[in-house]
Amino acid sequence: METLLDLLPRVERLGSREALRFWNGYRTWRWSYADLDAGIRRFVAFLDRKGVASGDRLVLWSENRPEWVAIFWACLARGVQVVPLDHQSSADFVSRIVDQTGARLLVHGGAASPVSGAECFAIESLNGLTIGPRFRPTPVSGSDVVQIMYTSGTTAEPKGVIHLHRNICTNLDPILEEIDRYKK
């Protein structure tokens, strides 16, 4: 596997099988791979309309939820670098990260207050977007950036750590080999 995009065809192929399960404290939400595919296509179309393209950065500041996963994969499909932040981060910290990274778009959860410096999008709005057509992922290589993860800043100011497709795929390859082995 060269890039994480090599996994996208599996999403289409698995259709109605369960992809994600999320408990929000009151009920369990389930997303099939078809739901995930629709979410990815919705956000890819949104990125295309906004002109957010390969090499741009997007800050993803939200609690864990299925839409987070769809938005992450949509960004990968367009070569957009994701900067995921803990949903409990302060608006001041998020604003500094938006400035440091030059993010074009900030996706935030409902409890988070939008910050200046980037266009804001509420993650809960994903399902209200129009599902885009099938798309061809933007070509990427193993040396392209997937995400910039910020350290906790325990001993100093938090720093952005770059994760490449190659780094993540190196960790995933043995796992996928085992999964494929047991499918037989």
Question: PLM features: residue spans?
Answer:
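A short N-terminal helical cap/helix-turn-helix that marks the beginning
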Residues: 1-20, 38
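Conserved pre-ATP/AMP-binding loop-to-beta segment of ANL
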Residues: 16-18, 133-150, 157, 180-184
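Conserved AMP-binding/adenylate-forming core of the ANL superfamily
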Residues: 20-52, 56-65, 69-73, 90-95
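ANL superfamily adenylate-forming
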Residues: 25, 108-143, 155-158, 169
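Conserved AMP-binding A3 loop
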Residues: 30-34, 146-173
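Structural detector for helix-capping/boundary residues
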Residues: 34, 50, 56, 104, ...
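A short helix-loop-beta submotif of the ANL/AMP-binding
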Residues: 57, 63-83, 87-91, 100-104, ...
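Conserved ATP-dependent adenylate/AMP-binding module captured primarily in the ANL superfamily
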Residues: 87-115, 130-132, 171-184
